[in-house]
């Protein structure tokens, strides 16, 4: 048994499950494998633009969890195993979309607890992981991540984008999260014109925010 990836390549479950899950959980950072190293130093800085992570002196950008294919349902959230969650990821904490700035665990139960900054209000929220026992002696911990919308960027306008939604509507004035120089990177990619630039958008009761982007090259359009 196996699965087909986005490029139509077949992968065996026996050899590819862990790699596939890592790509799904961190779609824009699957080339990094150092997240299993629990001894790396992480420094979290929170300022007026939002939390920023520095790992080994390198500033890292917002990272998100994006469901793909059949997983991208109409649900507002998607479950994420806790062992794939890192500081800097976006989760739903207390019903709010937040960027994780702290992860702790109970010394007695090893249950994870996450602290994050609300992407829209900048308030702090905390929530513990959901623990289940699908089989005897098997413990699974999960958290909820938001389901993202993918919009095709049509134009760039002073810190916002004009985009074609999944339903075919045109929306203007969608703000870009002011972090990690994201707006400038989107602008550069759009002006280069090497492919169709897609914005990954999070929704909060009608308010929308661009939190990342990807480029779809002509061979995959």
UniProtKB/Swiss-Prot annotation:
A motif (Microbody targeting signal) lies at residues 219-221. GO terms for biological process: positive regulation of translational elongation; translational elongation. Transmembrane segments: none annotated. Gene3D superfamilies: 2.30.30.30, Nucleic acid-binding proteins. One of its GO terms (cellular component) is Woronin body. InterPro entries: Hex1_S1, IF5A-like, NA-bd_OB-fold, Rib_uL2_dom2, Translation_prot_SH3-like_sf. It is found in: Cell septum. GO terms for molecular function: ribosome binding; RNA binding; translation elongation factor activity. CDD domains: S1_Hex1 (cd04469). PANTHER family: TRANSLATION INITIATION FACTOR 5A FAMILY MEMBER. Major component of Woronin bodies, fungal-specific organelles that occlude septal pores in order to separate intact from damaged compartments. Hex1 binds directly or indirectly to the Woronin body tether that in turn is anchored at the rim of the septal pore. Belongs to the eIF-5A family. Hex1 subfamily. Forms oligomers. Self-assembles into hexagonal rods. This is Woronin body major protein. It comes from Emericella nidulans (strain FGSC A4 / ATCC 38163 / CBS 112.46 / NRRL 194 / M139).
